[in-house]
């Protein structure tokens, strides 16, 4: 634990909190709530340290936590675990939950409604093995994820259809900015695939990947905010009369690519593209639901005893 905490301290030393806040505000066109952004930036290091202590393995350079860069960030400040950071975070948290005797996990269980009494949430109704189960609780937390499953092109799993949001709307729980939907610039283009799109991580561009049109010419700064890059790609696709543009990483060292982006390399290879030699066909796809159930700084919704966290909020 000591060595892991020290690694997180190294992260903190290299982090410029004020610049992080400004980058976030600028990318959000200053529509963000400053107080919320300040908390995000100031608590980020503590959260990373907690994850390291839980057992999250982050990539390192010279024994210290490594950083990459993504869109709208003015410096390298993104910590990562190979090219499957989200999966690593998820698995680390699941393992931590399994250790807690006060947490009971119900897998393959679907929430279909919450139970209310006098504008107070007192439980939920779930389906498991085709059986309806009523769970009563003093507090209910919605963490049902996003809405990507309703889009033809999305990097999300198909089962993410906004169920938590629908339940909140049914009970007149306040929502906010539900028209704010993030379109990721670079999902792997497959002509006849209506399933979940393979995300080509933004860090690929952060490590030097270049976006090219059909003439193999760059047409945008790859590290502008995602909405700006996506709009530029859509515009270029229309000009090229194509459903994709190219992402080129062939100028990068092949062994580095195979190591740093092992998952993307393997998945593209399965789909017939060797990223060390071939241009990657990419197109924008729905990625993240920016709006959701309105909450305060403690994740409390407009309904008593009901909270919301994560992408649904």
For the regions a protein language model found, what residue spans apply to each?
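A glycine-rich dinucleotide-binding beta-alpha-beta segment and adjacent secondary-structure elements
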Residues: 107, 112-127, 260-313
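Glycine-rich active-site loop/strand segments that organize a redox cofactor
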Residues: 10-40
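Core beta-strand elements of the Rossmann-like FAD/NAD(P) dinucleotide-binding domain
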Residues: 131-139, 302-303
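Glycine-/small-residue-rich beta->alpha transition segments that form the dinucleotide
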Residues: 137-139, 143-148, 312-313
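An anion/pyrophosphate-binding glycine-rich loop and adjacent beta-alpha core
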Residues: 167, 173-280
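Single conserved hydrophobic/aromatic residue that forms the stacking wall/gate
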Residues: 1-8, 12
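Conserved redox-cofactor binding core of oxidoreductases
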Residues: 52-131, 143, 187-191, 211
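A short alpha-helix-loop-beta-strand transition element characteristic
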Residues: 31-38, 48-66, 104, 174-177, ...
């Amino acid at each position: 634990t000591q060595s892991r905490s020290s690694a997180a301290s190294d992260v903190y030393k290299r982090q410029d909190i004020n610049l992080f806040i400004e980058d976030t505000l600028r990318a959000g066109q200053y529509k963000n709530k400053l107080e919320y952004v300040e908390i995000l930036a100031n608590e980020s290091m503590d959260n990373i340290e907690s994850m390291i202590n839980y057992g999250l393995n982050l990539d390192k350079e010279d024994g210290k936590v490594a950083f990459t860069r993504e869109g709208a960030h003015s410096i390298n400040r993104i910590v990562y675990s190979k090219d499957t950071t989200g999966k690593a975070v998820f698995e680390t948290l699941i393992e931590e939950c399994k250790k807690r005797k006060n947490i009971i996990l119900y897998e393959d269980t679907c929430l279909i409604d919450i139970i209310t009494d006098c504008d107070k949430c007192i439980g939920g109704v779930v389906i498991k093995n085709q059986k309806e189960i009523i769970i009563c609780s003093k507090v209910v937390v919605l963490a049902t994820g996003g809405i990507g499953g309703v889009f033809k092109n999305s990097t999300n799993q198909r089962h993410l259809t906004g169920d938590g949001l629908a339940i909140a709307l049914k009970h007149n729980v306040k929502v906010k900015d539900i028209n704010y939907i993030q379109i990721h610039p670079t999902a792997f283009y497959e002509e006849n695939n209506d399933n979940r799109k393979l995300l080509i991580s933004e860090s690929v561009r952060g490590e030097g990947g270049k976006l090219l049109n059909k003439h193999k010419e760059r047409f945008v700064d790859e590290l502008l905010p995602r909405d700006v890059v996506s709009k530029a790609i859509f515009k270029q696709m229309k000009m090229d009369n194509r459903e994709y543009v190219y992402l080129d990483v062939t100028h990068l060292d092949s062994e580095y690519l195979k190591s740093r982006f092992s998952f993307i390399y393997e998945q593209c290879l399965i789909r017939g593209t060797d990223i060390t030699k071939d241009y990657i066909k990419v197109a924008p796809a729905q990625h993240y639901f920016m709006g959701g159930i309105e909450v305060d700084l403690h994740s409390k919704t407009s309904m008593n005893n009901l909270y919301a966290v994560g992408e649904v909020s």
